[in-house]
Amino acid sequence: MRCLVTGVAGFVGSHLAERLLKDGHEVCGVDAFIDYYDRAIKEKNLEGPRSWNTFSFIEGNLIHLPLETLLDGIDWIFHQAAQAGVRASWGEEFARYTECNVLATQRLLETALHGGSIKRLIYASSSSVYGDARSFPILEESQLRPFSPYGVTKLAAENLCTLYYHNFQVPTVSLRYFTVYGPRQRPDMAFHKFCKAILNHEPIRIYDDGYQTRDFTYISDVVEANIRAATCEAAVGQVMNIAGGSRVTLRSVIDILQEVSGSPVRVTFEERQHGDVRHTFADTQRAQQYLNYSPLITLQQGLAEEFDYARSIYRLVKTA
């Protein structure tokens, strides 16, 4: 298949592109290199995909690119591109979130509608659409009440996907990711920050009391869900939770990191941040039903992989 991966230089996009290439597909990757974090990190993420002669890359923003040309001959679209970050989505920055997350998605859907050859459009949604949930595990039918401007834009884009499916039969699938982690995780995300702090012998900063819980999902499980969403006909039109299968406190995460790092860990507790939810925990029965999805990587295994990755990149920085 000929695949388009948007946000290909990012955390999920780069892993997904590598998997598609290894599976024998042709991949066109697009990325705008938005300055949310260092471009050099994204360039490093692209080293794997760029080693394949079946990979091509276009730098540009989906708002401005000629999408008719971009989608010509494409079978599968994996729409991972977004302006990320819950805490940064307040205030004047919201305009960027609406442009990158809502308007870009609408342009992609409209072009897919008129392009004619798209077999699947998989949208990377987010658990942020649920907001501060009150009952667990969270079902896809649970109340959607985003707790941040970022969550509002992710829900708006997801709703657009659903609308284009029901009105025009654009073959969309929306996957609601729950806290994805692993090698190449963005530097602003908690596990990356935790690993870096340990390596620098600095205290880990936790916002709130550490008893907040998350359903953490390892990157390879998220990639597998995307592949299955592209290949399972029954998935078309569905919205599904993609999660790791366990509810863990941040204090438990610290204990695991101390074990995998072999280093004592110091922690400081700070005020809860605007937009941060207290708990997440997903019901993934729908993904099991339609995708035969079942997460394979335990938190212990995944954190060990992420810590090894962090150790490799920050060792290089120190010795450079």
Can you annotate each of these PLM segments?
Residues 47-53, 168-169, 195-206, 260-270, ...:
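A short C-terminal helix-loop "cap" of Rossmann-like NAD(P)-dependent dehydrogenase/epimerase domains
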Residues 299-320:
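Amphipathic terminal alpha-helices
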Residues 155, 180-193, 200-202, 207, ...:
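Glycine/proline-rich active-site loop of Rossmann-fold NAD(P)-dependent oxidoreductases
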Residues 1-176, 220:
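N-terminal Rossmann-like NAD(P)+-binding domain of SDR-like oxidoreductases, especially those catalyzing
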Residues 209, 237-240, 249-255, 262-279, ...:
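C-terminal "lid/loop" region of Rossmann-like NAD(P)-dependent oxidoreductases
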Residues 222, 226, 242, 253, ...:
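Non-catalytic, hydrophobic alpha-helical segments
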Residues 100-103, 148, 185, 189, ...:
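Residue-level signal for the nucleotide or nucleotide-sugar donor/cofactor binding architecture
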Residues 16, 226-230, 257, 303-310:
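Hydrophobic "lid"/C-terminal helical patch
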